[in-house]
Every structure is written in C-alpha cells, then in structure tokens.
C-alpha cells in the first residue's frame, strides 16, 4: 500500500470517520472500496462506478418492499394508508423525499466532486448530532435545489 497516494489517504480518512462515528455502513463501504483498490479487482472500478448506485438503489428498494412481499405489512394495512390523514401525509412526504433522492442521484452523477462533501457531512451528522446515516442522496437532492443540477 502506497501511503503517499492521496486517494488512499482520503479513503482511509473517510473510513476513520466512519469508525469514529460508529457509522458501520460508511465504514464497510469504504473498506470494500479499499479492498477493491488494493487488489486485482481494481479493474472492475469502471463497472462499479457505472452500476454501483443503481445496484444499491435496487437493494434498498428490495429492503423497503420486503414487508409487503413477506406479508408482514398486509394488503389491508397498505390500503388503509389512503384513509388516514397521517398516512396520506406520509405518502406525500415519501413522494417528495423520493423526488429529492432522484435529484440527488442526478447531481451526484453530474457533479461527483460533491460526493465527498456529502459523505463527510453525513458522517459528521451521525457523529455529532446522533443522526442516522441515510442522508447522502437526500442531501444531494437538497443541494441540487440550491446549486442546480448541472
């Protein structure tokens, strides 16, 4: 490992932030990237860069939809969500957050320079404010509202 490689130093720094903030998701993700970077698997980075976000969103969607698919969240519960004002508000907020996430994906794809800032901000939010590490896509969506998507 070449410790004078700035990319490795950045990844190690982000991994350290993940460890310090007890953000296992960030820590594991960075460590996987380090393993890829330091092994012959490095040749797969173009594929990871092109498909990684899409695969991650697919896995996230599977996790969100699993309670419906397994029957834990019944069809009647889903249908009743259209009858209560809190559930209707949750639907509206879910639509808004999904829209923001979509803007975030576009921004992160078109302006990769913001990804590190979003990641550091998310890790700091977890470490300093007891936040939850679910924010980079939504944060990117909010950022896109402020700075534009190009």
Swiss-Prot record:
Q: Which residues cross the membrane?
A: 16-36, 53-73, 82-102, 114-134
The protein's location, in the record's own words, is:
Cell membrane
Swiss-Prot/TrEMBL keywords: Cell membrane, Membrane, Transmembrane, Transmembrane helix
**Record's keyword annotation contains Transmembrane helix:** yes
Task: Note the topology in the membrane.
Answer: Multi-pass membrane protein
GO cellular component terms, alphabetically, are: plasma membrane
Give the protein family: Belongs to the UPF0756 family.
Q: What is this protein called?
A: UPF0756 membrane protein SG1722
| Source organism of the structure | Sodalis glossinidius (strain morsitans)
């Amino acid at each position: 490992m070449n410790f004078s490689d700035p990319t490795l130093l950045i990844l190690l720094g982000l991994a350290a932030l993940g460890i310090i903030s007890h953000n296992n998701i960030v820590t594991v993700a960075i460590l996987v990237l380090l393993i890829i970077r330091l092994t012959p698997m490095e040749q797969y980075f173009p594929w990871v860069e092109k498909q990684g976000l899409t695969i991650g969103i697919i896995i996230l969607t599977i996790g969100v939809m699993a309670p419906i698919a397994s029957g834990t969240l019944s069809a009647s519960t889903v249908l009743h969500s259209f009858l209560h004002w809190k559930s209707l508000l949750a639907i509206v907020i879910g639509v808004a957050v999904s829209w923001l996430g979509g803007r975030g994906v576009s921004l992160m794809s078109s302006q990769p320079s913001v990804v590190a800032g979003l990641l550091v901000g998310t890790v700091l939010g977890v470490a300093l404010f007891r936040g939850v590490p679910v924010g980079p896509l939504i944060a990117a969506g909010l950022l896109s509202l402020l700075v534009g998507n190009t």
